[in-house]
């Protein structure tokens, strides 16, 4: 009994270091917000200007890796001996569900405004050219390229899970073929896991920092409750308590149902926006934007603006590539888990086609709606952002639709459920990664899950206190740096082991 307790308890070497590091950083930030903002700007400038090119090359190389998997010697290899666990339709639906987070609703609604007001390639702000390239850049940042990189890592994790039968809950577990068991389970593996966990904690905190203002702004619109930092903190606290109650009372089934409701409601809300906003314009704009994407793709892939120094690729492309890098392991583990029994080619094609369709639908519908509202002078987005903040501007793009009260209730419920499931997933992932061993079918310890949800909530509040998008972008970029190297190591480890294991079969 004692031994079982020890097994399911925390793993000190990967529990306490991230906790201490993140705690100290939060304390230093809160202690002097102005100084923290100076540091944040310096870190953002250094990473994006000095190392931005590395993130761009990483994505390009991983794209070539995707083609190698699809058309190479492993294309027909099956990831596990069993038949696929889910039907193709259910599998794609689960992929779509993984895309409908509140952070995605945040960027999908407002991103196009930033691209049009500060466009790439030296275009005039708010010009016809800027509007033509605006959605094309969203399709680039949230299209086949990043999903191709995820599919490569998903194949790697599915290989370790279902072919090599490894119990992978931390990235160090996958590095045995590359660095040897001694190093993977020793100091080197511990350092890798700690970097992964610190980056993941900040990534989850930033997602919460994006999602919370949407909910509190909805509350202000619906109930007249003023949006303040204190209200943000209260809402985050309520979510943490709700998550703790769900876990303590064994209501995980309820959380899964909530996740399904989120997916169906996402379809409903997107369909509503598509119909009432202007379906013909949306389809025409999408078609035009795909053409613009294909025409400018080579330049977009390698665009650093080294001569013009306008800052667009650093502020957006490098930021988003870091965003994809930082979430790669967590998302790839999930996508690998639901892909048991599929071939390498099936997984790669299914992910790129299914997930690209999901993100393209979201960005096209929401971005087109925002552009229409600006062009028709229904909303003054710059003024809303300056006077009330980005979250209010996003809320107003939804409130401007017909049946505004019903629409706002739908959006409020969608954001609320999305954030509840986000916190639940955060606490679960971090608890699993910081425990010694959690057997299949078991849940990680309650207190560990609650503890991590509290810490993620604190980070969200700290980022909100700093104000603006720059702290959130910097947290992602800084966290993406170590994950950049870890993702490469996982990829190389898979290639090295597959050459031996799959060659013999």
UniProtKB/Swiss-Prot annotation:
It catalyses: 4-(trimethylamino)butanoate(in) + (R)-carnitine(out) = 4-(trimethylamino)butanoate(out) + (R)-carnitine(in). Keywords: Antiport, Cell inner membrane, Cell membrane, Membrane, Transmembrane, Transmembrane helix, Transport. The chain crosses the membrane at residues 10-30, 51-71, 92-112, 143-163, 195-215, 231-251, 263-283, 316-336, 347-367, 403-423, 446-466, 475-495. GO terms for biological process: 4-(trimethylammonio)butanoate transport; carnitine metabolic process. Pathway: Amine and polyamine metabolism; carnitine metabolism. PROSITE patterns: BCCT. It is a multi-pass membrane protein. Catalyzes the exchange of L-carnitine for gamma-butyrobetaine. One of its GO terms (cellular component) is plasma membrane. InterPro entries: BCCT_CS, BCCT_transptr, BCCT_transptr_CaiT. The keyword Translocase does not apply. Belongs to the BCCT transporter (TC 2.A.15) family. CaiT subfamily. Disulfide bonds: none annotated. Homotrimer. It is found in: Cell inner membrane. Coiled coil: none annotated. GO terms for molecular function: (R)-carnitine:4-(trimethylammonio)butanoate antiporter activity. It comes from the Bacteria. It holds the Pfam family BCCT. This is L-carnitine/gamma-butyrobetaine antiporter.
């Amino acid at each position: 009994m004692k031994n079982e307790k020890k097994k399911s308890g925390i793993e000190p070497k990967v529990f306490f270091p991230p906790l201490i590091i993140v705690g100290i950083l939060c304390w230093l930030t809160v202690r002097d917000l102005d100084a923290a903002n100076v540091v944040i700007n310096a870190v953002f400038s250094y990473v994006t200007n000095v190392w931005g090119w590395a993130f761009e090359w990483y994505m390009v190389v991983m794209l070539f890796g995707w083609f190698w998997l699809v058309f190479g010697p492993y294309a027909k290899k099956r990831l596990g001996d069993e038949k696929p666990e889910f039907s193709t339709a259910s599998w794609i639906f689960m992929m779509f569900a993984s895309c409908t987070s509140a952070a995605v609703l945040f960027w999908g609604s407002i991103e196009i405004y930033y691209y049009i007001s500060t466009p790439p390639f030296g275009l005039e702000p708010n010009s016809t050219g800027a509007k033509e390239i605006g959605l094309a850049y969203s399709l680039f940042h949230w299209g086949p390229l990043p999903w191709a990189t995820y599919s490569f890592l998903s194949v790697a994790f599915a290989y370790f899970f279902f072919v090599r039968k490894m119990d992978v809950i931390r990235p160090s577990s996958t590095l045995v073929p590359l660095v040897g068991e001694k190093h993977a389970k020793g100091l080197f593996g511990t350092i890798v896991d700690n970097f992964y966990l610190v980056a993941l904690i900040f990534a989850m905190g930033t997602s919460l920092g994006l999602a919370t203002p949407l909910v509190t702004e909805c509350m202000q619109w619906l109930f007249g409750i003023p949006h303040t930092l204190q209200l943000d903190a209260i809402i985050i606290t309520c979510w943490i308590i709700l998550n703790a109650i769900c876990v303590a009372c064994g209501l995980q089934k309820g959380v899964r149902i909530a996740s399904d409701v989120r997916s169906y409601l996402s379809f409903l809300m997107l369909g509503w926006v598509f119909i009432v906003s202007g379906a013909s314009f949306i389809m025409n704009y999408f078609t035009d934007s795909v053409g613009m994407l294909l025409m400018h793709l080579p330049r977009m892939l390698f665009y650093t603006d080294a001569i013009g120094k306008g800052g667009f690729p650093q502020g957006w492309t490098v930021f988003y590539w870091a965003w994809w890098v930082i979430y790669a392991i967590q998302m790839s583990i999930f996508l690998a888990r639901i892909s048991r029994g599929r071939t390498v080619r099936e997984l790669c094609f299914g992910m790129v086609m299914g997930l690209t369709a999901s993100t393209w639908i979201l960005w096209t519908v929401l971005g087109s709606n925002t552009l229409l509202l600006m062009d028709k002078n229904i909303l003054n987005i710059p003024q809303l952002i300056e006077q009330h903040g980005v979250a209010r501007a996003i809320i107003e793009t939804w409130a401007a639709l017909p049946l505004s009260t019903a629409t706002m209730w739908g959006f409020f419920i969608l954001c609320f459920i999305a954030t509840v499931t986000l916190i639940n997933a955060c606490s679960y992932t971090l608890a699993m990664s910081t425990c010694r061993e959690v057997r299949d079918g078991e849940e990680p310890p309650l207190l560990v899950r609650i503890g991590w949800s509290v810490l993620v909530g604190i980070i969200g509040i700290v980022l909100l206190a700093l104000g603006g998008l720059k702290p959130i972008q910097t947290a992602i970029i800084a966290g993406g740096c170590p994950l950049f190297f870890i993702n490469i190591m996982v990829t190389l480890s898979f290639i090295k082991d597959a050459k031996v294991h799959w060659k013999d079969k």
